[in-house]
């Protein structure tokens, strides 16, 4: 079996469920050692237990730093390098959404989204990039969203934060290219995560009607895009925001 990430070391934030967990599994299946990061020890331990059952020979670890704490992030990334010998791939997937209307938005709600969806991406990318530069290169991948391009009628903090991620992605691609560090983002459309699965059918059906492929995306669909961008098959791809949405907004 051809393994696209053989002998690579990856960090995946927000890796305990949904898209992040699918990315972790896809990377392991393709030969990578993976450190999955989550917000709580309990969820990290549960994810590790599942992975060890599925992939008993895999090289995996789990961590739960506060991603807005620069010192914690730097320490954890350095630990990953010590554990596995390198940091080749960083996937900034951790994030939160909010559906509050603009008129009712509280400043602390907006700041919370910025902290995790933007500041955390900056912190993790900066710490990882320093190691990647020393190694001679690496890959940074960010989770964006199609609403970063088209907006949404409520919860403006989420699309605003993902638009910021797009800008950071493109800027870092230009700045870090000389150090052989590629930076891209994946912008998923409606994907069958826990959040979407909880929506009533009356909400889901109209959404599916807007998708030419006639279905919502699966986490594995998004994970496949991350796998491609992380691999050497995308060695000349950087600064891109790859939409994976079934042509919902094309």
Curated annotation (Swiss-Prot):
Single GO MF annotation: quinone binding
A Pfam family reported for this protein in Swiss-Prot or TrEMBL: adh_short_C2
Annotated active site: 158
Uppermost EC category: oxidoreductase
Record-annotated membrane-spanning stretches: none
Amino-acid biosynthesis among keywords: no
Catalytic activity: lithocholate + NADP(+) = 3-oxo-5beta-cholan-24-oate + NADPH + H(+); deoxycholate + NADP(+) = 12alpha-hydroxy-3-oxo-5beta-cholan-24-oate + NADPH + H(+); deoxycholate + NAD(+) = 12alpha-hydroxy-3-oxo-5beta-cholan-24-oate + NADH + H(+); cholate + NADP(+) = 7alpha,12alpha-dihydroxy-3-oxo-5beta-cholan-24-oate + NADPH + H(+)
Keyword NADP: yes
InterPro entries documented for this protein: NAD(P)-bd_dom_sf, Sc_DH/Rdtase_CS, SDR_fam
Alphabetical UniProt keywords: Lipid metabolism, NADP, Oxidoreductase, Steroid metabolism
Binding-site residues, NADP(+): 93, 158, 162
EC number: 1.1.1.-, 1.1.1.392
Tree of life domain: Bacteria
pH-activity relationship: Transformation of DCA is more efficient at pH 10 than pH 7.
Any one GO biological process: bile acid metabolic process
Function noted in UniProt: Involved in the modification of secondary bile acids into iso-bile acids (3beta-bile acids) via epimerization of the 3-OH group through a 3-oxo-intermediate. Catalyzes the oxidation of deoxycholate (DCA) and lithocholate (LCA) to yield 12-alpha-hydroxy-3-oxo-5-beta-cholan-24-oate (3-oxo-DCA) and 3-oxo-5-beta-cholan-24-oate (3-oxo-LCA), respectively. Is also able to catalyze the oxidation of cholate (CA) and chenodeoxycholate (CDCA) into 3-dehydrocholate (3-oxo-CA) and 7-alpha-hydroxy-3-oxo-5-beta-cholan-24-oate (3-oxo-CDCA), respectively. Can also catalyze the reverse reactions in vitro.
NCBIfam families, sorted: PRK07231.1, PRK12826.1-2
Family of this protein: Belongs to the short-chain dehydrogenases/reductases (SDR) family.
Listed name of the protein: 3alpha-hydroxysteroid dehydrogenase
Organism encoding this protein: Mediterraneibacter gnavus (strain ATCC 29149 / DSM 114966 / JCM 6515 / VPI C7-9) (Ruminococcus gnavus)
């Amino acid at each position: 079996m051809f393994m696209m990430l053989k002998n690579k070391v990856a960090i995946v934030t927000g890796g305990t469920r949904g898209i992040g967990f699918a990315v972790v599994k896809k990377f392991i299946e393709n030969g990578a050692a993976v450190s999955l990061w989550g917000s709580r020890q309990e969820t990290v331990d549960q994810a590790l237990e599942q992975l060890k059952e599925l992939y008993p020979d895999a090289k995996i670890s789990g961590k739960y730093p506060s991603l807005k704490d620069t010192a914690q992030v730097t320490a954890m990334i350095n630990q990953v390098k010590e554990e596995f010998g390198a940091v080749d791939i960083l996937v900034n997937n951790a994030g939160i959404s909010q559906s509050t209307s603009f008129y009712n938005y509280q400043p602390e709600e907006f700041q919370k989204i910025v902290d995790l969806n933007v500041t955390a991406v900056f912190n993790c990318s900066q710490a990882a990039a320093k190691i990647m530069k020393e190694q001679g290169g690496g890959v940074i991948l960010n989770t964006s969203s199609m609403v970063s391009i088209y907006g949404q009628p409520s919860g403006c903090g989420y699309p605003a934060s993902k638009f910021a991620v797009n800008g950071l992605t493109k800027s870092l691609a230009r700045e870090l290219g000389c150090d052989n560090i590629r930076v891209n983002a994946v912008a998923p459309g409606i994907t069958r995560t826990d959040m979407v699965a909880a929506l009533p059918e009356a909400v889901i059906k109209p959404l599916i009607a807007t998708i030419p492929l006639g279905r919502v995306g699966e986490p594995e669909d998004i994970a496949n895009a991350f796998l491609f961008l992380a691999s050497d098959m995308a060695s000349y791809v950087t600064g891109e925001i790859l939409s994976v949405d079934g042509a919902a907004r094309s």
